[in-house]
């Protein structure tokens, strides 16, 4: 009988130690820091930085990523008060967030483009799904 009790005690101890080790792995995975750039979770995106050069236009830049004329027109209407598309400036930086297109895997799909108006202020253009959105924000000083 004593042997039986010892075997049960050992089994319970083994099970509880195994359960504790699984919990610690789950906690470690949950605590993994996210890569946030301009308020966007950059994990899963290819992030590229560019500088506006002479001759660049928003229409041309966005067209090179397959953004349709209709979406550019919607973007133009949304940005009139925030950052008119005509105000693109040579030397200013912009960042693209792209990932592989699920239908055409040879093409990169643009989800976000961030334009730095100056060293502090930036504008995020979002093209996720059929949605076109714009938000203005600033870096912490």
Feature names for model-found ranges:
Residues 1-18:
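Sec-dependent bacterial lipoprotein signal peptides
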Residues 20-141:
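Intrinsically disordered, low-complexity regulatory tails and linkers that flank structured modules
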């Amino acid at each position: 009988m004593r042997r039986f009790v010892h075997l049960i005690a050992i089994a319970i101890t083994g099970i509880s130690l195994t359960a504790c080790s699984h919990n610690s792995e789950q906690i470690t995975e949950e605590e993994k820091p996210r890569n946030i750039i301009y308020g966007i979770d950059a994990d899963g995106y290819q992030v590229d930085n560019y500088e506006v050069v002479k001759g660049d236009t928003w229409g041309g830049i966005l067209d090179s990523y397959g953004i349709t004329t209709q979406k550019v027109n919607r973007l133009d209407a949304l940005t009139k008060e925030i950052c008119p598309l005509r105000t693109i400036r040579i030397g200013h930086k912009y960042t693209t967030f792209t990932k592989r297109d699920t239908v055409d895997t040879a093409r990169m799909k643009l989800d976000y483009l961030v334009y730095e108006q100056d060293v502090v202020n930036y504008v995020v253009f979002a093209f996720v799904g059929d949605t076109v959105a714009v938000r203005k924000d600033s870096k912490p000083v």
